[in-house]
Each structure stands twice: as C-alpha cells, then as structure tokens.
Amino acid sequence: MVWPARMAMLERARYHLTIWQARSGQVLARQERDPSSFPPAPPALDGTRYDVVVVGGQPEGVAAAVSAARQGVKVLLVEKRDGLGGLFTYGWLNFIDMNYGPKQELLTRGTFLDFYRQVGGSVFDVAVAKKVFRDMVERYPNLALSLNTAFKEPIMEGGRITGIKAVREGQEITFYADRFIDATQDAVVAAAAGVPYTVGAEDMGEPERRQAVTLVFHLGNIDWGALEQAVKEGRIKDAKISDRAAWGFADVGAAYQPSTPRLRLRGLNIGRQNDGTILINALQIFGVDGLSEVSKAEAMELAQKELPAITAFLRERLPGFGGAKLLGAAPELYVRETRHIKALYQLDLNDVLFNRYFPDAIALGSYPVDVQATSPQDTGYVYGRPEVYSIPFRSLVPQGVDNLLVVGRSAGYTHLAAGSARVVPIGMATGDAAGVAAAYSLKVNKTFRDLAADRADIKEIQDLLVKAGAYLKDYQIKNPLENHWAFNGLKFVNRWGLIVAGYNNDWKLDAPVNQASFYYMTANALKRAAGRGDLVAAKAAVLKPYLQREPLTRGNAARLLLTYLGEDAAALDPAAAVARAAAKGLLPVDKTGSDPQGIVTGAEAYYATERLCALVGKI
C-alpha cells in the first residue's frame, strides 16, 4: 500500500512543477494604526518589563512580534543570532513552500504576504530577506529587539512564566512580561517551562524516526542560460526553470553516489541570488539528533566534506555547471523536525488531508504532507495533498503553562501533520495569530486556555486577524468519503501513517491488497496505535509465510487477524476462519461478502486493521 520510492520522488518533483508562479486572489488592505502613534517600548536592559516577550527571531517570531506590536502593546523580541530570519537567512532556505487555495488564491497572508512582496516572490536573495525582517521590526517603536541574546531558562510561578533569563555578551540578563511566545525552532522555552512534548515520530511509537536534515550549499560561476535552454529543450527529465529558480532534477540526484550511506542527494531545489550565484537545497543527512549540538556539528562536518565531490559531479552532469565553483555552505543546518509540544489540541493527519475547518481557526494551509526521508532505506513519502485546512488556536496553547503560546514547526502538530504544517508561511500565519491573541488576552485579562474555551473571544481574535490582513475563509469542503462504510478504517490507517495517498489523494479503497502489505499494515498498526510491539514480535515467526507479494484472500486475512488474537488459525479452513473473524467483528462480510477466496481490497483491509487494534486493546 506504499508507493515505490522512485514514484514518490518523481511525483514530488512533478508537483513542484505546477506551483511556481505566485498566484493570489483579491487581498484585502490591512487596517492598521500609524506605528508612530504607539508609545515606545523600553530598551532591552536587564530587569525590563514588557507586555509580551517573543523568544526566537525565526520568520515566525518576527511575525509574532510585529503582530503584537500592531495591536499597540509593548513587545520585546529576543534572538540568539546577530540578525533575524533564522532558517531563511542562516539556513539559507530561500525557496518558499507556498500555500494556495482551490482557485490559486494565497492562503497565508498577513506578515508573510508583506515579506513575500518585499523580497520579490517565492525565491529570494538571503541578504535582502535579512534586511526585510530587520526593517519590519524597526518600523514599530513599541517593539524592542535584543540580538545576540540566548534564552537560558524561564522564571516560573506555578503554571505561569513571569520572566526569562538570557545571556548576552557573556552576561546574564532578565526580562519580565505578562505574556510569552515561543518562536524558537525547537520550542526551547516551552520545554524548559515543563510543557510535555514528543520528539520526531515518538507519537507513533518511533522516537528515533526523524526527517533528514539538509545543508544548503552555495555555488558560483553558473551559466544560467545554458541550464535554462537544456531544461526547456527537455534534455533534463522532470525539471522546471524560471529566471529565479530551477527544481525537480530527480534523476540527477539519484545518480549521485555519496561517500557514506548517511548522505543522499535528492532532487535539486535551486534558488538564484541577486549576484547570479545559486543556493541548492538537496543534500540529505541521516541519523542527526536536531536537539544535540554535538550531533549537528558532526553532521555539518560530514556534509561539508562531501560538497567538493557533489560540485564535481554537478559540473559533469548539468549543462551550465561546467565551471561551477563551490563558494561555501549555510552556517546552519535545515532541521525539519525535533519537538512537537503537547497542546490543547493536537492537529493530526486526518485534520489536514480531510480539509478540516475548526471553529477556532487562526491560519490556513494547503501544502502537501511531504515527510522527508527518515533513513537511507526510504526516500520520504507524500501522504496526501489537502485542498485547504485550518490550524486551530488550541494547537498553539501548550499544556501546563497558562501564559505561553508556541508557534512554528514545534507547535501542537503530530509527526505526520507537521509534514505540511511545518512550512514557514503557515508558521508565520500562526505567529500573526499568537501576537494578536497575546495582545487581546491582556486587554480582557484572560489566560490563553480561557480564550480557547470561549467562542466569543475566539471570534474577536479572528476578526482582529482579518483586519490585520489574515485570510480565514471557511471553504466548507465536503468529504465525499465520509459516508463510505470503511471511512472509520480509512481515518485510522491514515492517522497512523499506514497508507500513502500521494499528490492525487488515491486512498486505494478498491485496489487489491497483497499479503505482505496487509501484514505490515497490521503489524505497524499494533506497534504505533496499540503499543503492542511485543505481540508483533511474538507472532512474527508464525506469520512469516504471509510475507509474500501475492493477492490476499479473505481466508488468509482472517487467519492472520485471528493469529494476533491468540488463536491457532492455521488449523482452521478458510471458510471457518472467515466466519470466526466476522463473528468477532474483524471482517465486514455484510459489505464484502464471505467468499474465503475473494481478494481483499483496501477498504476491507483498513476496516479490519482498525477493528484488530480495537480488540487487541481490550485483551
């Protein structure tokens, strides 16, 4: 039930061929007070108090700080680096993952749209982006900025943060506030404050499973015209090019042989800089703990050593690269995933792929659920492509701390939902929401938890967001599958990452299932959803004969299911096995018939997998 790795790579490349041009519908003008009318914020000195403190100068943090400042409150933005922009300006990710609606209207507006317009589109010059972020912040006199300031720890009183300790120029300093926003990549403030969280795919029972990290590298002396001609003449498969970017190139990446299996060159995302040089996002590094500075430093060294060989390979492989020169690499790695905080609501894959609109929606997204490779044994999977889904305010509100919001990729998303929700434009939209909510909560003197529970307060926050330029349309997208008899089973296997629907959302409900696919589906479901890896291990030898790529009959499906329930199913004839499994509610024979030689389809397999886990949970 999983696409072959090669197909996944090609489909990912083809998808990106279709979304190059910026395509926005009518955008409402922002209703904003003159920033000069705001009382200035005090300078970032030790012991200073603010209304709102934002930790993290990532794009999401800039959005949060600017959004709060637009509401007239006094804000401090704390950033450990010497500038703003984080992943965009220090990880050199200069190729934006855009989110469009059904009519190609831009979904992520507000501060992101401001940034997008000022940098000139979805591919930008890193130096320009860094300046744009700085200019955004400096526009507001009530927004103070403290660079080169590393968060150290929160000051807690019960379930509230009253201040933070930070280090600047070797000296410890303290800032106080009534509201805090964690916009760090790894939710470091939330974690230090005691907010519970999972790491990587821990919420699926696989804590060591994390998406590959990437080192973006910098090449010069590129003949862009020669590359453009080759792409447009079709001499390079699955590639697309404009005056600012080129992408695809799946065959090129696949042809490179790295010096170690911990590295892989995937399809190339190439973004031009204003000086004609290029940045390439393609080099994947496996086995990296994004929460360990030692692990990241080792990964950086490993990747940097590989870059001369990659450059030489591209010189030989790509038109226009014959004289390519390696100019360096990003100062930081592109880490796609570390923590996922536990929030009042955990956005999951079904919410994303079935286009859920929440009553407390504060941002919209549509980016495909693109989970990058987690090991050298896979190339990553596109679990599906939503039309439009929403992020609920509750997913920004962490459990256990009353006056903190978390924005960006480490907010309240499951591992799989984050495959879409992690992208920066969505993160900046959540930053806008956090800034507005922080200011509003001060006005009404309510905690974020209280706001989340009050529909009237949420409506006020949504209205303020729209006035500030956000886009929160309820598309009321109907799901044609919700009346299907196997829909609960489909949602179950989808929630646990047991099927891969691809860019076309092919759920394979009517497709025949083979024995091996059903074995792995049920085994992984028991491990991930029921926490019964012990049961899977205990039955592995007995079920080994099912590891065959041949059609799955209903009789064999029944035997496998009954084996997990502790029965000697091998002794049953196929018809008796089907009858017994049906009696236990494992097989929907009223929908599919009871022929033991009938071939099981996806719908029946999903139904059976969900029912198996439900029964095992009662053993």
Walk through the language-model features, giving the residues of each:
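N-terminal propeptides
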Residues: H16-W20, A456-I619
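Glycine-rich Rossmann-fold phosphate-binding loop(s) that bind the pyrophosphate
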Residues: V55-P59
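Extreme N-terminal leader/targeting segments of oxidoreductases
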Residues: M1-V52, K131, L145-S146
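Conserved beta-strand-loop-beta-strand element in the redox core of flavoprotein oxidoreductases
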Residues: I155-T174
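Short, well-ordered coil/turn residues at beta-beta hairpins
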Residues: V167, A183-T184, V407
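Conserved N-terminal/central alpha/beta ligand/cofactor-binding core
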Residues: E32, A41-R49, S67, V73-K74, ...
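Flavin (FAD/FMN)-binding glycine-rich loop and adjacent Rossmann-like elements that form
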Residues: E172, R179, V188-A433, A437-R455
